[in-house]
Every structure is written in C-alpha cells, then in structure tokens.
Amino acid sequence: GRFGGGGSTARSGGVVYAGGGSALQQHAGYADDREQMFEYLRMEVRDAVDETLLWRFCEQSLDQLEWLEALGVPFPPTAVSPRKTSYPEDACTLYFSGNEAAAPFCDGARPAPRGHRVAGAGRTGSVLFGKLRAATAASGAEIRTRCQARRLLTTPNGDVEGVEILELRAPPAIHRLHAMLFELGSWGAMFSPRLVAFCQRSIAALERRWGRALRIRARGGVVLCAGGFAFNTAMMNEHTGWFRVARPLGTLGDDGSGIELGRSVGGAVGEMSRCSAWRFISPPTALTSGILVDHSGQRICNEEFYGGTLGQRMALCEG
C-alpha cells in the first residue's frame, strides 16, 4: 500500500457483520438463520447488490467468522450490549449494529444482533487488521508498504498483465515523516481542510523526490483493493451532491486512486453518489424517544435507525 497498511479497516471499530446462528448469537440466546439475515439485508441494500451475491454473503457468513477466529481474531462470547448504542462498551462483543430491531425492518425479518465486535479496549480495527497482516506474512507473501500503484500495465489486446508502482526509497527519517504526515492529515480532516491539503501536497513532494518507479508483472491477474474517495475533493464535487460539504472520515488513502485505476482499463463504476454520513443520537437512549423533524416540522424517520441511515435521511431533506 501507499502508506503503512490497514487503511480505514485498522482505524475502524473492528465490527464484523455476521449471522445465521454464530456461537456468540447462540450464547446470547438469539435464534438466527441465513434466511432471516438475507431478508433483512435485502430490505437494506435494495437493488444495490445482486441477490445471488447477497445470498452468498449470508450463506458464507459463519464460515468467514470461523476463518477469522482460526487466524486468532478474538470473538469471546459475552452478553449483548444492553442498550441502543452507536458502538458497544469494551465488555461486549455482540450488538445490534444496524436497523435489525427498528421498524419497518423488524416487521420483515426476525431481529437478531449481528455486529460481532473484535474483543479489546476501544476501537479494535487495529486488532483485526493486525491478525490479518500476521497471517499474510506467515503465508510467505511479500508485503510492500510505502508503494503507490500508479498505472495498470496492459497487453495490446487490453488484458491487464501487471502494475507500475512508485516505491518510496528513502532514509528512515523520510519514512517517519511520510508516516507522520499521513497520520496528521487523516486525523486532522475533522478539523481543518487546509491541514489535509498541506499534508497531501507534502506527501506528494516526498514521493516525487524519493520515489522509484517499478513494474511488477502479474501471472494471474491484479486485484485492486483500495478505499473510497472521501479525500478527493474533485471526485466529491463531481459525484456526491450535498455530501461534498461534510468533513471526510477515513484516511488520506481514500483518494479514489483505486477506482480510477479500474476505470483506466475499462472497469465499470456505479453508485458513485452514495455516501455514508453518520449522525448518531444515542447514547443517550432518551433521545430516541423524541421526534426528529426537518425544517418544516415533518418527521424525518424512525429515531432508532442506525446512524448511517439517519445521516442519509437527514441529508436528503430539502433545505
């Protein structure tokens, strides 16, 4: 990766969405199955995800969870978070992470908590990614950081046969500065757009000075695994409407470069206007007993909705 690895996953809450009767669900006394999970998710995603793919996700959910546990990702059985919350306390590893218990979703599918939180103190995305990284290293795969994918290499008939990267070949002090600017720009995004722009320019300058272009040939294809484009002002202005005025959440790696690489060789894109802008009103849970209204006094939605849904409904309000 261009930076140190992990991206937004390493900064996340470490919540894995899984269901169908996991050990944690059974321990907490919840009967769940793949069919109920599918019905709920179908209401959530609507036509954004092909139903065949959605069913495969539900069908393989428990296998994925067991695979993570086999890699050492900790999901010890605990009590379900006892209240509506945006993120559970350290003592909980299972909670209602979406709209499962909120109407109208609970009318169409039996509610069950499916947010499996990696055990640990605070946000545990770093624990999740740490285990994945360790397993990757143990497999013998070569891990390269401070390497930016710049261009996909193609054959005359358009097949992708490799990738051109820009590797930061610099003294340790420059690597530390590169990492510091990444952290500063990623965390500072909530406070200062100018700081983000400064860090982006500084990182680009370091890469121009110390970067070395390399070409890597691929025998079995190239997999693009990158973030969104919350930190790309031009793409936000082009695609996202009102969301463009919100402060970006993620890391400086969410610059849309992976999307643009795919498009450069004819890849199709969709749902580019979709954004997740969270607005949590609980805790305190007392606020969910109130009525959330728009500028004209009309109720916006069920106040117990997940923060991502709540934020989206608020953003769609006129005025």
Regions found by a protein language model. Give the residues of each.
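Glycine-rich FAD pyrophosphate-binding loop
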Residues: 1-13
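A short alpha-helix-loop-beta-strand transition element characteristic
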Residues: 9, 48-53, 67-85, 268-275, ...
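Hydrophobic "anchor" residues
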Residues: 16, 160, 299-300
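Glycine-rich active-site loop/strand segments that organize a redox cofactor
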Residues: 16-57, 69
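Glycine-rich, N-terminal phosphate-binding loop of Rossmann-like dinucleotide-binding domains
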Residues: 20, 167, 226-227
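Conserved redox-cofactor binding core of oxidoreductases
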Residues: 56-212, 233-234
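Glycine-rich loop(s) and the adjacent beta-strand/alpha-helix scaffold that form part
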Residues: 171-280
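An anion/pyrophosphate-binding glycine-rich loop and adjacent beta-alpha core
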Residues: 259, 268-319
